[in-house]
């Protein structure tokens, strides 16, 4: 028994070491980042709704730049009756969120570390002045994607704030996520399995990457779009070097291993069966869109959204061939140039 325990411990040590064995992780310990967290979620759901006028006025004094956009744009209400209705409907969701996020320090610490890497690579970039945890409506995954240029993220950036939508991070086994209505109308199980705290920093960094280098790939052909998305993933990897790739990609560990083991076959299939320069929306959705798997590949092992992963590998190859380029220069390189100079030929 002792030998078995020792063996398990050794495997654990090796696994942990392998996650932190990257040579390209810079030392950011001297970079000062302190994020201000203002608990809008608590202020809103702990207000006295019997005196709604007074409560809303107090909230508006405390959050003058945020309350109106939250109510009108995010929640979609314009009067006190609508506010009360939203309050009653989502108060149980808020109560559930407090069991996990009453202490927000673990999330704050994750974000501060990520922003240290952001500041290392982009010293002039200023993190949001305040982090605002919220509990908002359970919009559909399609609505969320429209808000984020095609990428699902429930979070949002304002002029001086970053909103974290806690209703989408209550744990994959949260009872509401398992209901038929939620699965069919909000997020299927392959997506809600990522509704965990560990994914918050990765999904926030998607917003930051897009804030730094807005994704303009919507009208591009397939291969260029894959590479543009891959550039975003490459940059997120720079911001989260200590985070496992399964978190950054949203793939399961099994799906990630399948990609790594079949990289050459994936690329061969795509160049053989697809026009890399097509703008056909169905083809693009096959490789860029969310899904339980990618059509044409293993339903048991392949992930959806496979195109950005291939794009990421192409960008990594290009970056390795161009060590003189800084991250900002790589991000500003056209996908055509990246494809040409990467000389991507996986085995």
What role is predicted for each listed range?
Residues 16-18:
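C-terminal motif of bacterial Sec signal peptides marking the signal peptidase cleavage site
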